[in-house]
Amino acid sequence: MRRPGAAALAAAALALAGCAQIPREPITQQPMSAMPPMPPAMQAPGSIYNPGYAGRPLFEDQRPRNVGDILTIVIAENINATKSSGANTNRQGNTSFDVPTAGFLGGLFNKANLSAQGANKFAATGGASAANTFNGTITVTVTNVLPNGNLVVSGEKQMLINQGNEFVRFSGIVNPNTISGQNSVYSTQVADARIEYSAKGYINEAETMGWLQRFFLNIAPW
């Protein structure tokens, strides 16, 4: 025979497990880096031209073209958004009618007058605003080359400061025609750009809601 206390403990354990913090997954494309493919074996045909040479031509610019090449992303994001909404409804009704009474009830009540009134009114307003600014630079790696020549890039930068580990991640699709002579491109010119700035450490843990507080927040009816 099972004890009721064991079932209660199991239910409490499941409830607390449901309130546990969900690990946050990165929004950037993985992996963060890619190695270039191995070049073919060198051949010695006995002439100046070597078809197995994997380096860049002498008069070719140094812009990234292949998997493993690096590119500098200039992050310059400034986004402002404002939203407002409102709703207003008003409805009123009034009804009155007489109901004749028959038989011996007529002498008692004569006529019964019935009336009904109703009113319904609703008014609501809402608004939201957001402003985000992110400036900086990060160097990423070409992880894939699409059939049309666009470059899939991703990379991260980690900084260990005292007791906290801060990192910046970036991924997106770059058109090689937008890359400048300094081998850089603005984040506003990157398609499907995903920028992530986060941290791990005591400061980040202090900003996280405790498990017991999340438990009462989930079961609170208000």
From Swiss-Prot:
Topological type in the membrane: Lipid-anchor
Q: Entry's Pfam families?
A: FlgH (PF02107)
> Which species?
Burkholderia mallei (strain ATCC 23344)
Keywords, sorted A to Z? Bacterial flagellum, Cell outer membrane, Lipoprotein, Membrane, Palmitate, Signal
Annotated lipid attachment (S-diacylglycerol cysteine): 19
GO BP annotations, alphabetical order = bacterial-type flagellum-dependent cell motility
Q: What stretches pass through the bilayer? A: none
Please explain the role this protein plays, according to its UniProt record: Assembles around the rod to form the L-ring and probably protects the motor/basal body from shearing forces during rotation.
One Gene Ontology cellular component annotation held by this UniProt entry? cell outer membrane
User: Where does lipidation (N-palmitoyl cysteine) occur on this chain?
Assistant: 19
Q: Which family does it belong to?
A: Belongs to the FlgH family.
This entry's Gene Ontology molecular function terms read:
cytoskeletal motor activity
| Gene name, Swiss-Prot/TrEMBL | flgH
Q: Where in the cell is it found?
A: Cell outer membrane; Bacterial flagellum basal body
In which broad location class does this protein mainly occur, judging by the first location in its UniProt entry? membrane
Q: What is this protein called?
A: Flagellar L-ring protein
UniProt superkingdom:
Bacteria
Q: Which HAMAP family match?
A: FlgH
Q: Where is the signal peptide?
A: 1-18
The record's subunit annotation is:
The basal body constitutes a major portion of the flagellar organelle and consists of four rings (L,P,S, and M) mounted on a central rod.
